[in-house]
Amino acid sequence: MSKSKDDAPHELESQFILRLPPEYASTVRRAVQSGHVNLKDRLTIELHPDGRHGIVRVDRVPLASKLVDLPCVMESLKTIDKKTFYKTADICQMLVSTVDGDLYPPVEEPVASTDPKASKKKDKDKEKKFIWNHGITLPLKNVRKRRFRKTAKKKYIESPDVEKEVKRLLSTDAEAVSTRWEIIAEDETKEAENQGLDISSPGMSGHRQGHDSLEHDELREIFNDLSSSSEDEDETQHQDEEDINIIDTEEDLERQLQDKLNESDEQHQENEGTNQLVMGIQKQIDNMKGKLQETQDRAKRQEDLIMKVENLALKNRFQAVLDELKQKEDREKEQLSSLQEELESLLEK
């Protein structure tokens, strides 16, 4: 297709939101919906040179207005048949009109400043006056503060106190008359303590020798007593052997009884482990039944919704969702049957 030279290029629309007091907003809304030709005479917008203030006249009633920046960009849509919508522009500003306000606010005279930081800060403060903290609906009140909070900056940790303490210690060391240092190893101290326990002093040797002679006399008396009582022990030796045989049989019985108790404990532990496994599988089966019931309910609601919808595209979309639910239902049924088979095999054991 050839494009004629007379065709003008398409221009992008520049749009903003106009917010009026309730009584004037209803008047403008009725005039727009009625489609009067004289709408330009009833509604006029005039902006001042600063680009932030202006005057909006509704039926020749002047309203003070201020152009503010919205928290985020919104899309503007246009429709002709109320079915198909077309995007026309991105909106980021709103003209707020009030009854009580200065129609002609005082003009701020620029002040020449040599400091670039001060001038930059002043421009930033000036822009803050025209920042709108709220959205265009009630739930979005203070949305700029709630959604766009300032992030905490990473602060580098400085340690001036530590450096000051190190300098103080170094200065005191330099002023000292003399210094002495000693390295103590933990292993060496332990060895010295062990050696100190084994080595005795020479002053104690005489006392140790006298003590050994007394112990020798006591041992001689004990051996004499033992030799005199050896005959009595021979008489009672036969009786002790019989007692030992009786004790051995009792120990064998106790050992057998202990083995049986251990076997019963092991069997009891195996039964407890099986019971816990059965309870775990039963819990999984109950959960899977709940999920399966929920999936079936969702599929039933989706089928009812498909029956009510007449739009073909929407019906196809709902049908795709229903197919996914059916596949999910089949998978859950397979999982449930496998869990039930596993539970039956455990119960048979």
Swiss-Prot record:
The modification Phosphoserine is found at residues 171, 200-201, 213, 264. Phosphorylated by CIITA. Phosphorylation at Ser-264 by TAF1 in early G1 phase disrupts binding to TAF1. Ubiquitinated by TRIM26; leading to proteasomal degradation. Residues 230-247 have a biased composition (Acidic residues). GO terms for molecular function: DNA-binding transcription factor binding; histone acetyltransferase binding; nuclear thyroid hormone receptor binding; nuclear vitamin D receptor binding; P-TEFb complex binding; protein heterodimerization activity; RNA polymerase II general transcription initiation factor activity; TFIIH-class transcription factor complex binding. GO terms for cellular component: cytoplasm; male germ cell nucleus; MLL1 complex; nucleoplasm; nucleus; transcription factor TFIID complex; transcription factor TFTC complex; transcription regulator complex. Residues 244-349 form a coiled coil. Pfam families: TAFII55_N. A motif ([KR]-[STA]-K motif) lies at residues 3-5. Its main location: nucleus. Ubiquitous. It is found in: Nucleus. InterPro entries: TAF7 (IPR037817), TAFII55_prot_cons_reg (IPR006751). CDD domains: TAF7 (cd08047). GO terms for biological process: chromatin organization; DNA-templated transcription initiation; estrogen receptor signaling pathway; mRNA transcription by RNA polymerase II; negative regulation of DNA-templated transcription; negative regulation of MHC class I biosynthetic process; negative regulation of MHC class II biosynthetic process; negative regulation of protein kinase activity. Changing residue 264 to D: 50% reduction in TAF1-binding, reduced incorporation of TAF7 into TFIID complexes. Keywords: Coiled coil, Nucleus, Phosphoprotein, Transcription, Transcription regulation, Ubl conjugation. Residues 105-126, 186-212, 227-247, 328-349 are annotated as: Disordered. Overexpression of TAF7 in HeLa cells inhibits cyclin D1 and cyclin A gene transcription and causes the cells to accumulate in early S phase. In contrast, depletion of TAF7 from TFIID complexes by siRNAs increases histone H3 acetylation at both cyclin promoters and stimulates cyclins CCND1 and CCNA gene transcription. Belongs to the TAF7 family. Component of the TFIID basal transcription factor complex, composed of TATA-box-binding protein TBP, and a number of TBP-associated factors (TAFs), including TAF1, TAF2, TAF3, TAF4, TAF5, TAF6, TAF7, TAF8, TAF9, TAF10, TAF11, TAF12 and TAF13. Part of a TFIID-containing RNA polymerase II pre-initiation complex that is composed of TBP and at least GTF2A1, GTF2A2, GTF2E1, GTF2E2, GTF2F1, GTF2H2, GTF2H3, GTF2H4, GTF2H5, GTF2B, TCEA1, ERCC2, ERCC3, TAF1, TAF2, TAF3, TAF4, TAF5, TAF6, TAF7, TAF8, TAF9, TAF10, TAF11, TAF12 and TAF13. Interacts with TAF1; the interaction is direct. The TFIID basal transcription factor complex plays a major role in the initiation of RNA polymerase II (Pol II)-dependent transcription. TFIID recognizes and binds promoters with or without a TATA box via its subunit TBP, a TATA-box-binding protein, and promotes assembly of the pre-initiation complex (PIC). The TFIID complex consists of TBP and TBP-associated factors (TAFs), including TAF1, TAF2, TAF3, TAF4, TAF5, TAF6, TAF7, TAF8, TAF9, TAF10, TAF11, TAF12 and TAF13. TAF7 forms a promoter DNA binding subcomplex of TFIID, together with TAF1 and TAF2. The [KR]-[STA]-K motif is specifically recognized by the SETD7 methyltransferase, which methylates Lys-5 in vitro. This is Transcription initiation factor TFIID subunit 7. It comes from Homo sapiens (Human). The gene is TAF7.
